[in-house]
Each structure stands twice: as C-alpha cells, then as structure tokens.
Amino acid sequence: GNGRLGAMVYGTPGIEQIQLNEETIWAGRPNNNANPNALEYILKVRELIFAGKYLEAQTLATEKVMAKTNSGMPYQSFGDLRIAFPGHTRYSDYYRELSLDSARAIVRYEVDGVQYQRETITSFTDQVVMVRLTANRPGQITFNAQLTSPHQDAMINSEEGNCVTLSGVSSLHEGLKGKVEFQGRLTARNQGGKIACTDGVLSVEGADEATIYVSIATNFNNYLDITGNQTERAKSYLSEALVHPFAEAKKNHVEFYRQYLTRVSLDLGEDQYKNVTTDKRVENFKDTHDAHLVATYFQFGRYLLICSSQPGGQPANLQG
C-alpha cells in the first residue's frame, strides 16, 4: 500500500490475483447519523455505569443514545487485477517474499526451464500499482490481464492506447444510495513482443519484459464534498506514472518508504532461523521462542501502518 491505494498479492503462478483497494471507496454517501437526543441521556447513562447498573445503562444507551438512521457506512473493495499466464499451472522452485525493507512483494518460480519473477509495488511517489514481469530468457512474457469488481453495475471498457477502464459507484447501504464514484485504469509497457487490448482484456505476447500499471481514483474530496472527477484523476495518476522507467519508479518508492521505516530499529539478537520460512517460524515459535521473529513482527506492524495511512489521506481502517 501507499496510504491511498492497497494491493494484496495472492501469488498464484497460473493466475495472479491482486485485490485492489482505494481509501475513499465506502458504501452509501456522506451523512450524519448522530442521534439528536443523545446529549440529553448521556449523563444518565454515565450515572448508571458508575452505580454498577450496567444492563440498565446499556439498555438506555441503546434506546436513547445510539443512531436511529444507520449504523455507519462500510468500507468497500475496488476489485481485483487478474493476470493469466498460459502454461504456468505446472511450476517448480516456487518462492514468495514480502520485503519489509523495501515495501515490495516478490514471486519467483520456474516453468519448463525458464525462471519467472513478478515484483509488485504500490508506489508512494507515483500513486499507482506496478507489477514488473521478467524472465531469464527473452520473449517469454505472455499474459492476459483484466480488472474485475464486486460492484454489480461496474462498467468495463477498452480505450485507445491499450488501456482498460473499470468505472462504478459504491453500493446502497441501509437505505442510502451509493454516491462514491470511482474509476480504475489498466495498461502496460512492454519491451519486445506484442501488446493489444480487446473487450476489456489487456494482452501481451512474447515480450522480453513488461510492467503493468493500475491507477484508481474517486470523486471524494472530503467528508461533505464528493464532486471530484474520478476519471481525470485516474488519467492523471497514470499518465504521470508512465513517464518514469520502472527502475526509477522503484528507487523513488523505496527511498520514500525507508524514510519512515528507518526511524526505528529493534534488535533482539541474531537470526538463528534465517533459512526457515516465516509460516514455519510462526508454527514453531512455541518451542523456539524465536526472538528475531518478534522483531520482524514489530516491523511488520510498522510496515502496515506506513502503507495504510499517509499524511493528507484517510486514517487506517479495518484495524480491529
């Protein structure tokens, strides 16, 4: 994530799925669900609590203090980026990594003697999701990519310049019609091979390497103003990101992230299990008391907050 966007990489070789979030996609619309009569009863609720009459306090609060209109609007996902790689269902030497040092997700594996790598960043500096696809032999990058959405009325189109768009609006919730409008834009830049865009599917065939770009934006300006232009915003993010080569974009992204990460370090001793995968280290923790894993979890928590909320944006949600 980069504070505004989030990308969850599943890492399946044959069909990669990357769930996409944008921080302002919420169901319903801006509204005030505060109970206007709440103030009158809050003091009485407090008195009941301090008197140890908890059930009475709860009953009174539910009846007189809680909202009567709705329980609040839920956060919603934008959708998924799905990338199909023909012939990649039978693979070997699979490896995946989330780099807490550089905020990158990496997947590597081998198919028919060819080594493939996917490197995903949600760029802090370019405000788009990038997926870098490489192989150790030329002409081996072939895929079909598309955007999908759980929103029933989402519209998918192909545009000039080998670009797929997905446009929609947030869902109805508790009687409030969704009014947060959003658009995602998908394109790619390839070296060698062919690229085409037909019926909402972006296809690359026989490339030496390629980079997939996803831009997402909404009409949200602030809590009371959703009159922004999501299409122009998504176009702007994408066009500005395409100016930079991936190597430069990654360098800028990592440098931005590390200015937060390196503020704090935690050393709990030597890493005695560096050759053991993280899932096994968690499983074995009750026996190993793996101190380095504790330090890693500490930094993982910091990584999550850095990547889920940035200055000027929304506070991190789904933290319960």
Where are these regions (language model features)?
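Aromatic-residue-lined binding/catalytic grooves and analogous aromatic/hydrophobic interfacial grooves
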Residues: G1-G320
